[in-house]
């Protein structure tokens, strides 16, 4: 069927931009992607915010201070020092423990043929034992002296 001769043929409706009043002659702010392709985000800058200025940070300098403690050498005698646990000036308390020299002396005496338990004499001699140093105030272990 054809349209009546007195009426014009209907045309396509106007586009959205024409209806709303958007000027289609202005260029788009971002490139228009082609059909079938996704924009990858390259070359697109985020919008600039106005109003508050960007805060400027001042560089912070950090200075490290090293406090070197005097080196305390532990021997088989009490040592005067500052306790690292209670920070008091102390003279260490000694405790003798069987160590490598004690056991080697015992083994050597055993190989030489000491009979009737004479090879156990090194366990009674403090001069052959290792020495542990303790704080007399807080009983903290502050050091040790190994004979071997």
UniProtKB/Swiss-Prot annotation:
Protein's cellular compartments: Cytoplasm; Nucleus; Lysosome membrane; Early endosome membrane
UniProt-annotated binding residues for Zn(2+): 83, 86, 135, 138
Domain LITAF: 62-147
Gene Ontology, cellular component aspect: cytoplasmic side of early endosome membrane; cytoplasmic side of late endosome membrane; cytoplasmic side of lysosomal membrane; cytoplasmic side of plasma membrane; Golgi membrane; lysosomal membrane; nucleus
Region Membrane-binding amphipathic helix: start-end pairs: 103-123
InterPro entries found in the cross-reference section: LITAF (IPR006629), LITAF_fam (IPR037519)
Membrane topology classification: Peripheral membrane protein
Motif PPxY motif, residue numbers: 13-16
GO molecular function, one term: cytokine activity
PROSITE patterns xrefs: LITAF
GO biological process per UniProt: cytokine production; regulation of cytokine production; sexual reproduction
Chain intervals for the UniProt region annotation (Disordered): 35-56
Superkingdom: Eukaryota
Keywords: Cell membrane, Cytoplasm, DNA-binding, Endosome, Golgi apparatus, Lysosome, Membrane, Metal-binding, Nucleus, Transcription, Transcription regulation, Zinc
Domain description: The LITAF domain is stabilized by a bound zinc ion. The LITAF domain contains an amphipathic helix that mediates interaction with lipid membranes.
Physiological role: Plays a role in endosomal protein trafficking and in targeting proteins for lysosomal degradation. May also contribute to the regulation of gene expression in the nucleus. Binds DNA (in vitro) and may play a synergistic role in the nucleus in regulating the expression of numerous cytokines.
Family, as annotated: Belongs to the CDIP1/LITAF family.
Protein name (Swiss-Prot/TrEMBL): Lipopolysaccharide-induced tumor necrosis factor-alpha factor homolog
Lineage: Eukaryota, Metazoa, Chordata, Craniata, Vertebrata
């Amino acid at each position: 069927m054809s349209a009546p001769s007195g009426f014009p043929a209907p045309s396509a409706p106007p586009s959205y931009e024409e209806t709303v009043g958007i000027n289609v002659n202005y260029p788009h702010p971002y490139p228009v992607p082609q059909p079938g392709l996704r924009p990858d985000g390259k070359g697109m800058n985020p919008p600039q915010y106005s109003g508050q200025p960007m805060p400027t940070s001042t560089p912070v300098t950090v200075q490290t201070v090293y406090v070197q403690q005097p080196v305390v050498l532990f021997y088989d005698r009490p040592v005067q020092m500052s306790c690292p646990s209670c920070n008091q000036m102390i003279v260490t308390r000694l405790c003798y423990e069987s160590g490598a020299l004690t056991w080697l002396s015992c083994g050597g005496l055993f190989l030489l043929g000491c009979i009737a338990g004479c090879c156990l004499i090194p366990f009674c001699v403090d001069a052959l034992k290792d020495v542990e140093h303790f704080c007399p105030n807080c009983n903290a272990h502050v050091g040790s002296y190994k004979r071997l």
